[in-house]
Amino acid sequence: MPWRNGPHTRPPGGDAERDRLPRAIAARLIRAGRLADVPAASAAAGLAPGRREPPRMPLGQWSREVFELVEWRRFEAVVEALFGQAGFETRSQPHGADGGVDIWLHSIHHADGDAPVSIVQCKQWMRWKVGVKEVRELRGVMAQHGIARGQFVTTSDFTGDAREFAAGNGIGLHDVDGLLRLIATRTPEQQQALLQVAFAGDWWRPTCASCGIKLVERTARQSGRIFWGCENYARGCKTQLPVRYQARAAADKP
């Protein structure tokens, strides 16, 4: 599963493209006293470009800020681990078309042990509420697979129409506040384990949804614009994300 990454290590040679945090994320952590700026003068100079050592665990407890900092794949990994702590066997697709399902939930108590008992859709949105359209789409996938229960998890909120539709169609909704309340019911050890999932590996660098690999920071030749690009560009992957929207840009669109 995607969250089972090894411990974070700096690439040999200090590759600036890989060990530099997006400026918006670094600025936030430096001002909060959670990140030591490697060239010390850069913070005093208004966070001028410079290499920064990514923190292994920038936050020690759960809050909305965790979901604002980590990339979309880390968010989905936390959701998967959270359901795993509840006793479900989970299965996820690391990349590529997911058919509307981010996580499959299986139960050892189900008559057919191989059949999923529920499916989960995740949206790491920050600026928009999840609407009835997205919830209807999940219901359609449930019907396609003959599954009676579904779960929709988001880092934002749901519209009133979405909540009304979900209530009558076997779909559990988990907004950011509900997600944090659910995490708070876990033991301190389990909560720390979930934080380790959230901040595993290069938690600030977005994952290519098509290839399943980490995007790298690129600079456009003509405009000088900095963006996230896929290392498989030469092989045909055109995935690009604007750095200014941080790692969550991939999922922060309706």
Q: Where are the model-predicted features located?
A:
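Mixed-charge (Asp/Glu-Lys/Arg
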Residues: 1-99, 104-254
